[in-house]
């Protein structure tokens, strides 16, 4: 929620009023539905806290580079100094939890499956964003 508010404020500075935007107008997305339906803690941590946050770190770094190239230093700074470090922390937290939770071969396999499915879904969603909206440098938080 903190990042959403910061991004909405930045969009306002750029001339877009995000107050009327409802990110859930189309309902929950496929990745959220997948994460929400995972039955075990190790799967939820592997898919969400570890993998999804790792994706966010990579996508945010790409977005920072895009903003720098486009000359939008303020947005790049917001992502570089606040959002990306938070996402990196979330990913590291997921890693430390996984080291404790994935203590058996079965738990490790469940974590691997959940992580792989998260990566596949993220790739599908990124492909759809490119095909339908031409978006290829979307941030990941």
Model regions: which residues?
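Non-heme di-metal
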Residues: 1-141
